[in-house]
Amino acid sequence: MTIDRTYPIFTVRWLAVHGLAVPTVFFLGSISAMQFIQR
């Protein structure tokens, strides 16, 4: 009842957090890997 109402908000928030976190982690990981490879 209250779960049915808060569930879509939680999923949208979860998608927004992961949508921003995944590219950020991948971007930082690629930058650090490039710096380690160059040196």
From Swiss-Prot:
Topology in membrane: Single-pass membrane protein
Cofactor(s) needed for function: heme b
Compartments reported by the entry: Plastid, Chloroplast thylakoid membrane
Keyword set, alphabetical order: Chloroplast, Electron transport, Heme, Iron, Membrane, Metal-binding, Photosynthesis, Photosystem II, Plastid, Thylakoid, Transmembrane, Transmembrane helix, Transport
Positions with a binding annotation for heme: 18
Record SUPFAM superfamilies: Cytochrome b559 subunits
Keyword Transport carried by entry: yes
Positions of transmembrane segments: 14-30
Gene Ontology annotations for the cellular component aspect, listed alphabetically: chloroplast thylakoid membrane; photosystem II reaction center; plastid
Chief site of localization: plastid
Highest taxon listed in the record's lineage: Eukaryota
Gene Ontology process terms (BP): photosynthetic electron transport chain
Co-factor: note: With its partner (PsbE) binds heme. PSII binds additional chlorophylls, carotenoids and specific lipids.
GO molecular function: electron transfer activity; heme binding; iron ion binding
Stated role: This b-type cytochrome is tightly associated with the reaction center of photosystem II (PSII). PSII is a light-driven water:plastoquinone oxidoreductase that uses light energy to abstract electrons from H(2)O, generating O(2) and a proton gradient subsequently used for ATP formation. It consists of a core antenna complex that captures photons, and an electron transfer chain that converts photonic excitation into a charge separation.
Entry similarity comment: Belongs to the PsbE/PsbF family.
Assembly with partners or alone: Heterodimer of an alpha subunit and a beta subunit. PSII is composed of 1 copy each of membrane proteins PsbA, PsbB, PsbC, PsbD, PsbE, PsbF, PsbH, PsbI, PsbJ, PsbK, PsbL, PsbM, PsbT, PsbX, PsbY, PsbZ, Psb30/Ycf12, at least 3 peripheral proteins of the oxygen-evolving complex and a large number of cofactors. It forms dimeric complexes.
Protein name (record): Cytochrome b559 subunit beta
Protein species of origin: Oryza sativa subsp. indica (Rice)
Gene, per the UniProt record: psbF
